[in-house]
Amino acid sequence: MEIHMTSIQELVINFHMTEACNYRCGYCYATWQDNSSDTELHHASENIHSLLLKLADYFFADNSLRQTLKYQSVRINFAGGEPVMLGSRFIDAILFAKQLGFATSIITNGHLLSTVMLKKIAVHLDMLGISFDTGDYLIAQSIGRVDRKKSWLSPARVLDVVTQYRALNPKGKVKINTVVNAYNWRENLTQTITQLKPDKWKLLRVLPVYSKEMTVLQWQYESYVHKHQVHADVIVVEDNDDMWQSYLMINPEGRFYQNAGACKGLTYSPPVLEVGVEEALKYINFNAEAFSKRYQSIHLPLAMSAGA
């Protein structure tokens, strides 16, 4: 089936607020060359506010990307590292983005998402995204999804977080991200996903940005997808080819960045705060058609779908 670019409802910008994380996932590519914690924008709330204002001014107005994709709204997806580690600075960023008119979402490992934190952000959060790869503690250890005390996010804890979020924000959406890798591809999460009832379950094939460590073969990835066909109505499949140049991403220093290719690392723009959004976008390769394809594919049959 041939997919043509068409209009999308929502443009998503992924803002990785920090490289800091309480986990050490072996496949993680949320690391940036020459990034220093001292230069991450979150240290000064005015820098975060300035970045979000520049994004609002550009993406809410008429621009070439809007003419191409014809999007109606813009969502800021706050990611990391682990954004929840930033505490009040993370909360402030969500509230300010919402105040400007952005839809908001986060992707978190959920480990630090306390009841207190949820009560502060849930009503301002349109989508809660949780990165959850395994329901097996030993597999979690192998992947690096444990903290320094060897604690992890168990299926029971994920269910507790999701239940609390839905109670606080009944209109909010829940997304689960699972990275299919060399350690978890044999696992079956059907029972856990049945309990969580996510609005979307994204199955990402581990991406070899820096190395091929923990990658899986095509048949291994497809095996994982097909064993979970019972959840085909919410599954979004995202193979490696679907990910290249199909995301709008900003690093903790406020630079747009893009995957350069398999094991080739990343390319960067100058800081948005210095050159503005329009100029910064010229420095990265963003494939609007690939982005559009990911969002069109959500409702395609599972065997033909790509990620979103």
UniProtKB/Swiss-Prot annotation:
It is an enzyme of class 4 (lyase). One of its GO terms (molecular function) is lyase activity. CDD domains: Radical_SAM (cd01335). Pfam families: Radical_SAM. Disulfide bonds: none annotated. Its EC number is 4.2.-.-. It comes from the Bacteria. [4Fe-4S] cluster binds at residues 21, 25, 28. Residues 7-253 form the Radical SAM core domain. Expression of pVip58 in E.coli (strain MG1655) confers resistance to phages lambda, P1 and T7; delays culture collapse upon infection with T7. Catalyzes the conversion of cytidine triphosphate (CTP) to 3'-deoxy-3',4'-didehydro-CTP (ddhCTP), guanosine triphosphate (GTP) to 3'-deoxy-3',4'-didehydro-GTP (ddhGTP) and uridine triphosphate (UTP) to 3'-deoxy-3',4'-didehydro-UTP (ddhUTP), probably via a SAM-dependent radical mechanism. How this protein allows bacteria to resist viruses that do not encode their own RNA polymerase (such as lambda, P1) is unknown. This is S-adenosylmethionine-dependent nucleotide dehydratase. It comes from Pseudoalteromonas ulvae.
